[in-house]
Amino acid sequence: MWQSVFTFLQKIGKALMLPVSVLPVAGILLGIGSAHFGLIPDLASDIMAQSGGAIFGSLAIIFAIGVALGLTHNDGVSALAAVVGYVVLLATLGVMAKALGVESKNLMGILSIDTGVFGGIVIGGIAAALFNRYYRIELPSYLGFFAGKRFVPIITAFAAIGTGIVLSFLWPPIGAGIKAF
């Protein structure tokens, strides 16, 4: 049993390497841009700083894509499913935040509960699991267009709704605990 747990965690670790590999360039851009060196024009510094900040601000979706790709042998459909799932997750969390009276934040133009990178990793894992299970699914002929890989983003969207509802109850106390540190 421990061997299978270790193997699973090893797969997750490998999947996280792709999004982690983006962090150095984000740090370099942000650092050089924010330093406003005299040799670099102010406009170029501002562009670099904003570019690095944009990467750091998008880490959740970057991790969603990276985890999905890492757990599906780099199949692009899983990346699309992760993006669809992440956006649906944000929308669901936003609706639930309003219903529960929980603080929300503008993320990618959507008012939502901010789960940070955790939400991206979760939805990336869900997208990958659904891809690995359903990428060969056969549907009745009248739904044939949606069979196979085309089914994966659809089922991921519905899974993201359920995940968002569950996270809307679980994340606020967890997030508050993290903020307390």
Question: What are the roles of these predicted feature ranges?
Answer:
Residues 149-159:
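Small-residue-rich segments of transmembrane alpha-helices in multi-pass membrane proteins
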Residues 58, 160, 168:
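Conserved, well-structured beta-alpha core segment at the onset of a catalytic domain
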Residues 164, 171-181:
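Aromatic-rich transmembrane-lumenal/periplasmic boundary elements in polytopic membrane proteins
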Residues 23, 157-164:
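Alpha-helical transmembrane segments of multi-pass integral membrane proteins
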Residues 5-147:
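Early transmembrane hairpin of solute transport permeases
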